[in-house]
Structures are given as C-alpha cells and as structure tokens.
C-alpha cells in the first residue's frame, strides 16, 4: 500500500518528449511551459520561454506531437491557451513558439487544482486538433500550419457550458465514421451530442443533442 501511495503522489515537473529526430528531445517544464531542445551531443536551446513564470502546478502544461516531425502543440491545461512549438536542426532561427490561442478559456484561482481540464485530440487531418474542456463540454477547432503562421487559429464548435460548477473531467469525445464528426459524451450521465468540425467555414461547424 505504501508503494501505491508513493507512486500516485509523484508528479513530474520536467518531462522529456521523444521526437522523430533521434538526436533531439524536448524537455518541458510542466509547471511553467518552458520548452528546451536537448541534443545528445550536450547542446541545448530554449525554444519557448516560461508562459507562467510563477506556475506551481505540476502537469499544467503538456506537449502534443503532430504529424509534422518538427512541430508540437503545447497546451496550458488550466486555461486552454496553446502554442505551436517548432524545433529544428538548422539553427535557432528555425526554433520558435507561435501562439495559436492567446485568450484564457477558463480562469483558475490560486487554489484551483485542476487535472487535465483542457485536452487536445488529433484528427485525421494533420493540421487540425480538437480542444475539449472536459469539465463543461465546450469544444474548439485548433489549426496549426508550418507554411503560414497567420493561419493559426482556435475557433469554437460549442461555446456553451453543458454543465455548471463542475471541477473534474466528465466529458470525452469519440470519433465517428466521418473524419469530421464526433460524439461528445457526458460520462457521468450518458448524455450525448454529435458535433462536426470543418475547414470550410463556420456554417459547417455544428453541435446537436444526440440523445
């Protein structure tokens, strides 16, 4: 029992992420959002400076791998802010962190101790992720780009809270046959919604109660 307690109470401040370039890994400070590129010859570079300088919650920041080997998406799981993080072997001019969403989608208090509130899910379109607020069911479509940094965006699919005053993960999503459609599920009540993301415009993004 003591071993179980020790393992469940441990949280990583620094987390290493493998890349598809076997000489390099990314090291994330999960409390502040600082990202460093670590090369196996001993060199290192700061790709992203701390986003929350006074951050004190382990696991607050996460990196998500994309289908582009040089690109990760960093997510602040407390606020929903996210950044496109680029590493490189060509030099520091090719390393950067570009903001995708700079607006807080939730407002944690000092006492907030949220776990995985905001989560991201890759779609079958390599440039598109789904952002979920697992506490209240809000949804956004997140778009990144390696060609045009003016084409980064985070737009709502469902901007309305489906439950109020909840502070734990109760919502999940499930892909359907169409790559554009998913179920949104309240795992507590079984309530379901069907939603669609799209690259064609707002008229093609929708959510409806399923049952």
List the model feature ranges, each with a label:
Residues 5-11:
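Sec/Tat signal peptide C-region and signal peptidase I cleavage site
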Residues 17-42, 46:
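N-terminal targeting signals for Sec/Tat export/insertion, comprising classic cleavable signal peptides
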Residues 24-30, 71-77, 127-135, 181-188:
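Short beta-strand motif characteristic of blades in beta-propeller domains
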Residues 34-35, 81-82, 138-139, 191-192:
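Hydrophobic "anchor" residues
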Residues 38, 73, 85-86, 130, ...:
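Periodic aromatic/glycine/histidine/acidic cluster detector
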Residues 41-57, 89-114, 146-167, 198-211:
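Trp- and S/T/G-rich repeat-edge/linker motifs of beta-rich repeat architectures
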Residues 55-74, 106-126, 160-187:
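Short, solvent-exposed interaction modules
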Residues 189-199:
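Short, exposed beta-strand-loop hairpins at the edges of beta-sheets
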């Amino acid at each position: 029992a003591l071993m179980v307690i020790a393992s469940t109470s441990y949280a990583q401040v620094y987390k290493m992420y493998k890349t598809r370039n076997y000489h390099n890994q990314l090291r994330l400070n999960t409390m502040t959002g600082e990202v460093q590129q670590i090369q196996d010859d001993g060199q290192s570079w700061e790709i992203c400076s701390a986003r929350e300088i006074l951050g004190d919650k382990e696991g607050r920041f996460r990196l998500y791998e994309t289908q582009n080997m040089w690109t990760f998406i960093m997510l602040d799981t407390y606020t929903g802010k996210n950044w496109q993080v680029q590493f490189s072997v060509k030099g520091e001019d090719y390393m950067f962190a570009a903001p995708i969403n700079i607006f807080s989608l939730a407002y944690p208090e000092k006492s907030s101790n949220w776990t995985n509130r905001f989560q991201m899910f890759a779609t079958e379109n390599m440039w598109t992720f789904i952002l979920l607020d697992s506490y209240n069911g809000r949804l956004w479509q997140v778009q990144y780009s390696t060609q045009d940094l003016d084409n980064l965006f985070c737009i709502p699919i469902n901007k309305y809270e489906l439950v109020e005053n909840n502070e734990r993960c109760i919502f999940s999503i499930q892909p359907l046959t169409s790559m554009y459609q998913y179920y949104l599920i309240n795992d507590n009540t079984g309530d379901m919604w069907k939603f669609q993301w799209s690259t064609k415009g707002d008229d093609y993004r929708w959510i409806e109660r399923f049952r």
